[in-house]
Amino acid sequence: MEHTHAHLAANSSLSWWSPGSACGLGFVPVVYYSLLLCLGLPANILTVIILSQLVARRQKSSYNYLLALAAADILVLFFIVFVDFLLEDFILNMQMPQVPDKIIEVLEFSSIHTSIWITVPLTIDRYIAVCHPLKYHTVSYPARTRKVIVSVYITCFLTSIPYYWWPNIWTEDYISTSVHHVLIWIHCFTVYLVPCSIFFILNSIIVYKLRRKSNFRLRGYSTGKTTAILFTITSIFATLWAPRIIMILYHLYGAPIQNRWLVHIMSDIANMLALLNTAINFFLYCFISKRFRTMAAATLKAFFKCQKQPVQFYTNHNFSITSSPWISPANSHCIKMLVYQYDKNGKPIKVSP
């Protein structure tokens, strides 16, 4: 069967071969994507459960962003890995009607764009926390964070509508047009070049600031953990998505006809690497954060024993001194202006001493 979803094409046969011919990777793609779905979907669901508990206990913007990222990754795994690849190509083994097929394609682009762009406000949030700690709680608070997340989801969906006309550049009879070139370049800019530029610039400033203030840094502080998670997420994204962008542009402009089989193999591998990005965040969180590991273990233990998790005690109002990694709690009583509590709408209220 031909795989018409060119943006993540990794199916068992393409039009470069005769109908029914086997993919150069054999059954590797279907095995890989099946494992990716079986591993990534439960991992992201568990991540959503844990982060939901953390959001309920602590009014912290970064937890909201990571929660939104996990939800977006679930959508990517569902629409792209399950519906587009496994269901259409291997379970149903038939081409879907054009209109539903294109609608699903728009949802695929929307989910992958959301998964990428939700990390941008997280990066900005960490930049403000590290570089402008005195202003952090007046700029970043739960109510505003939720509005930003909703805006990202809506914007990514609306900007994905033009991808209804996404071209199938992988077919043998594909004829390139200027409109297709513009759409493909917009895709490359929006999913990789622009986000990576933002990540590189802001992360570089954060690293410089942390090194400059290293003598005052509070080791093991939560902001350090969140910043480490941010660096890891963005670095892995840039690494795993680079081959896919390179292969799209190479095939669009310079793939020789005699090397189409090799280009197909390399494109399949590039797409596998790109989608791997949606399934590994849970394991990164467990590796970096002891709190996340502990909560994951408790959640799994309660699930397999069919028991309720113990209710964690926390106050009705969360108090936060600062997200700066170099202000010691021992000296926090001297910083009266930085003590906040949150109202029922999640907006900060300064507490008088």
Curated annotation (Swiss-Prot):
Task: One GO cellular component term, please give it.
Answer: plasma membrane
An example GO biological process term is: G protein-coupled receptor signaling pathway
Residue ranges annotated as Extracellular topological domain:
1-29, 87-102, 170-181, 250-268
Record-level Gene Ontology MF annotations: identical protein binding; neuropeptide receptor activity
Q: What is its main location?
A: membrane
Q: Which PROSITE patterns match?
A: G_PROTEIN_RECEP_F1_2
Write down the glycosylated positions.
N11
Location in the cell = Cell membrane
Name the Pfam families for this protein.
7tm_1
Annotated transmembrane regions: 30-50, 66-86, 103-123, 149-169, 182-202, 229-249, 269-289
Instruction: Kindly report every residue range on the membrane side named Cytoplasmic.
Output: 51-65, 124-148, 203-228, 290-353
Q: In which tissues is it expressed?
A: Expressed almost exclusively in the brain. Detected at very low levels in the peripheral tissues.
In UniProt terms, what function does this protein have?
Answer: Orphan receptor. Seems to act through a G(q/11)-mediated pathway.
User: Would you identify the family this protein belongs to, as annotated?
Assistant: Belongs to the G-protein coupled receptor 1 family.
Its name, as the record gives it, is Probable G-protein coupled receptor 139
- Gene name of the record: GPR139
